[in-house]
A protein has these predicted regions:
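Short, acidic, small-residue-rich periplasmic hinge/interaction motif at the N-terminus
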Residues: 30-33, 40-45, 70-79, 88-132, ...
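Periplasmic N-terminal accessory/gating domains of Gram-negative outer-membrane beta-barrel systems
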Residues: 79, 92, 114-169, 175-210, ...
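Predominantly transmembrane beta-strands of Gram-negative outer membrane beta-barrel pores used
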Residues: 202-213, 219-226, 233-277, 284-292, ...
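Face-selective signature of the C-terminal outer-membrane beta-barrel domain
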Residues: 292-307, 337-519, 603-606, 654
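Membrane-embedded beta-barrel scaffold of Gram-negative outer-membrane proteins
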Residues: 362-366, 576-629, 635, 759-764, ...
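Gram-negative outer-membrane beta-barrel transporters
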Residues: 497-502, 607-610, 627-710, 802
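Surface-exposed extracellular loop regions of Gram-negative outer-membrane beta-barrel proteins
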Residues: 535-585, 606-626, 700-714, 770-774
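C-terminal beta-signal and adjacent terminal beta-strands/loops
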Residues: 702-710, 735-805
Length: 805
């Protein structure tokens, strides 16, 4: 009996020791670009044990000790990786790199889609590299083809998102918010986008419902990450509108990437109806330097210098508009010139400290400086006539009746200097299935403004406005300000993944607290989102997001126009201004499937925004003129669709379609907001010759509703009308001179140093559509106003040549 007891005791001890012998396996899963892969699955072969990686690609699981353990790493769109552990013990670190699944057809790639479980979508900018684009393949031009996004000016990098203005979009580069010039009023002046597409590594974009880590804007977030070069690399691009150069290099501890761009789109501006001497010169230099001090410390520097100069000497203009039965012609002869200068300097230093595998901190210090000058003195003599069948038919123009004759003079000396200095500390901590993010920010803003502009008109011998008591200007405005203010911000959020029998749940919740000493305003912004991938059918993914978002005013938004007893207008800073508020609810989903052995994805999002404390504004081309007062409320509601896939094997194409309505209560009258674009359609399509894939074609098409507008110094509650719809098709063809061979062998000559060389031809505005940017208003002595359309660019041909090495 005692023998049996001893045997049972021995068996119990052995069993207990086996139960206590646990192995802990942890590590990180990255892709072939060293980017962390979230939601990758790590499982133990032959068992039901498994976990998913967090937002940083980290994982951890514990298993009972065995002689041999096989760990399987998998993720949709990537090849599985297996690791066999022989007699594992204790804690084991296992870092794995997954490579994308692809079927090569020369250089064409067929890739699965990553599931979107949050409001932030990842965009592949490489698909847009050879696109026919006036801006030269800018990221913003790519963004404007997404669902819910629109752009009304091909010469500008600005875009509108779901009923918001250009000023309601946040743009980040490597975690640092960047800004655009404040005095730009037209696409001709704007120059180069602050984002250099040759340096971009990752693009993340949200049209609403974004998390608490992103700043106080109401509409969208564009988060850009510049890439780290892995070795010596570079590219050169030349076209009729400018050129670019980028090169990078990497060693064990140090990496650098530099980009130069130059733009001179004289031929494009020459297609405008206003003829004259256009002399635009836009230059941009950017650099990012990374140095790994130790395994725990890394320091980075991001720098940018942008010098944009625009000089224009107008000569004449002839514009025909109206209908067949009510045709009109507007003629102007000019004298004078415009000279603008926009200088931007930006620098950011970041220090990253990895405290442990689960915690890291980043300290950021950045400075932004803009020095802007808009100066013009332009006079003109104009004739507005009714085109008809009467008059002297032997002349070039057949004129009916004269509607307006006059002279005008426009003058401006607008100078603005602004600086933004910010310091922030951000951290990330992973605890089990939770990923905590938090941060503090202090931002100091300084504005120096000395602006003066006026306009004088003389119609048929009378100055406008005609009072009979002397000569008055039709418009004048002055602005003199020296303003300094400080903002403080804190955010904290948690991301949590939960795998149940029903499927995978992804939760994100956070708060954002802000204080601005200019108006003594404190803001509390809670935000939450939930993503779900059902286990019954993982081709579906659903997401729901909601939160309170604020548009914290910047300089233009809190300037209020005041007119004195002499009729002179000037801007004053409204210190009682409040942040505009948007309460958002967004519900969306994706469905991925395969057809013709190719991947496709159909996405849809339904959204509603309740708007309050609105600052009414009017849009004139790219100029947004705010009232400077919180005096309106409204809403935005709509639905977005996007069909994405490989309509042609190995190429990404997409179709976007949006329906939207936005309205506000302005002075007791319900009117559409200036961004009320009721419908929008965008297409980006790529193709190639199946037997000769070195020749590629790409097409970009946009068709969108016109926007509400009104006459100068008026408001929509009095009267408004809609501009014509925006219609544009750009097409391009590219031929790969070097690279792309099926066997991957490079030529045995000088061109062996190049990865690829592309020669391309683009046709901008293929169907020569006459799109309207804004209107020039002619007023006769009887105070009758005529809206003369200012048309955008007509059909143009561009030739480009690019080298990658």
């Amino acid at each position: 009996m005692r023998f049996v007891k001893h045997i049972l005791l021995l068996l119990s001890l052995v069993t207990l020791s086996q139960l206590n012998a646990q192995i802990k396996i942890s590590g990180k899963v990255v892709d072939d670009d060293d980017n962390p892969i979230e939601l990758a699955t790590i499982r133990i072969a032959g068992t039901a044990l498994g976990v998913n990686t967090d937002l940083k690609g980290m994982y951890s699981l514990s298993i009972a000790q065995k002689d041999t353990v096989e760990v399987v790493f998998s993720c949709i769109g990537y090849s599985d990786v297996k690791r066999r552990l022989v007699e594992p013990k204790g804690q084991i670190t296992l870092n794995v790199r997954l490579y994308r699944v692809s079927k090569e057809l020369a250089e064409l790639q067929v890739t699965e889609f990553k599931k979107q479980t949050t409001s932030m979508q990842t965009i592949d900018g490489k698909a847009y590299k050879l696109s026919p684009d006036v801006s030269g393949g800018s990221v913003e031009s790519l963004i404007s083809t997404m669902a819910g996004v629109s752009s009304k000016n091909e010469m500008s990098s600005q875009y509108m998102v779901r009923g918001g203005t250009y000023d309601e979009n946040s743009v980040y580069i490597n975690g640092i918010e960047v800004y655009r010039p404040l005095l730009v009023t037209s696409g001709q002046q704007e120059g180069l986008s602050i984002i250099n597409p040759d340096m971009v590594g990752n693009i993340a974009f949200s049209t609403g419902g974004f998390s608490a880590e992103y700043g106080d804007k109401m509409s969208s977030v564009l988060d850009i990450t510049y890439r780290d070069p892995e070795k010596l690399e570079g590219s050169v691009a030349l076209s009729l509108m400018g050129g670019s150069l980028s090169f990078g290099q990497s060693s064990k501890k140090f990496s650098q990437l530099h980009g130069f761009r130059y733009k001179r789109n004289t031929t494009l501006l020459g297609s405008l109806e206003t003829k004259g001497e256009y002399d635009p010169q836009f230059f941009d230099y950017q650099t990012i330097l990374n140095y790994k001090i130790t395994d725990k410390f890394k320091v980075s520097f991001l720098g940018n210098i942008a010098l944009n100069n625009y000089r224009f000497v107008p000569k004449n203009r002839t514009t025909s508009f109206g209908t067949i039965t009510n045709a009109k012609q507007f003629k102007v002869y000019f004298d004078g010139q415009e000279k603008d200068r926009f200088e931007t300097y930006f620098g950011a230093l970041s220090l990253n400290y990895r405290h442990s595998k689960s915690t890291d901190f980043t300290f950021l210090a950045s400075g932004y400086l803009t020095n802007e000058l808009v100066a013009y003195d332009i006079s003109g003599e104009y004739w507005l006539d009714e085109a008809g069948t009467s008059g002297d038919s032997s002349g070039d123009d057949v004129i009916g009746g004269e509607l307006g004759v006059g002279k005008y003079h426009e003058h401006a000396r607008n100078r603005l200097k602004a600086s933004v200095l910010s310091f922030s500390l951000k951290g990330n901590t992973s605890i089990n299935k939770n990923n905590l993010s938090y941060g503090l920010l202090m931002q100091r803003e300084n504005i120096y403004d000395r602006s003066r502009e006026w306009e004088l008109r003389d119609s048929a011998g009378y100055s406008l406005p005609h009072t009979g008591n002397g000569v008055d200007v039709i418009y004048n405005m002055t602005s003199r300000h020296d303003i300094s203010s400080t903002r403080f911000t804190f955010f904290a959020q948690d991301s949590y993944k939960y795998l149940s029998g029903a499927g995978l749940f992804i939760f994100n919740g956070g708060i954002r607290l802000s204080y601005w000493d200019f108006n003594k305003e404190f803001l509390f912004s809670p935000r939450i989102s939930v993503g779900f991938v059902p286990a019954a059918n993982d081709r579906f993914s659903l997401r729901l997001a909601s939160g309170i978002y604020y548009q914290s005013p910047f300089y233009k938004e809190y300037l209020e126009s005041v007119t004195d007893e002499n009729g002179n207008s000037h801007y004053v800073a409204n210190k009682n201004i409040k942040s505009q508020r948007s309460i958002q609810v967004i519900f969306g989903g994706d469905y991925t499937f395969r057809a013709l052995n190719r991947p496709f994805k159909l996405s849809a999002e339904l959204y509603y925004k309740n708007l309050s404390n609105l600052i009414p504004y009017e849009i004139d081309n790219l100029k947004v003129v705010y009232s400077g007062r919180n005096e309106s409320k409204g809403f935005v509601a709509g639905i977005d669709f996007k069909f994405f896939g490989q309509f042609v094997p190995g190429t990404d194409s997409w179709i976007s379609f949006s329906l939207m309505k936005t309205q506000e209560d302005l002075n007791g009258v319900k009117v559409p907001r200036p961004t009320d674009q009721r419908y929008s359609f965008a297409l980006y399509f790529q193709d190639y010759f199946p037997k000769f894939p070195k020749i590629k074609f790409s097409l970009r098409a946009i068709f969108s509703d016109g926007l509400p507008t009104t006459s100068p110094r008026s408001t929509r509650d009095i009267a408004y009308f809609r501009t014509p719809s925006y219609k544009r098709v750009d097409i391009g063809a590219s031929y790969q001179l070097v690279g792309g061979s099926a066997d991957g062998v490079r030529p045995n000559n000088f061109f062996r140093h190049f990865k690829s060389i592309w020669l391309g031809v683009d046709v901008f505005n293929l169907f020569d559509m006459a799109n309207v940017s804004n209107y020039y208003w002619v007023t006769d002595v009887n105070n009758i106003q005529y809206a003369v359309p200012n048309y955008l660019t007509s059909r143009q041909i561009n030739v480009r040549l690019s080298f990658d090495f």
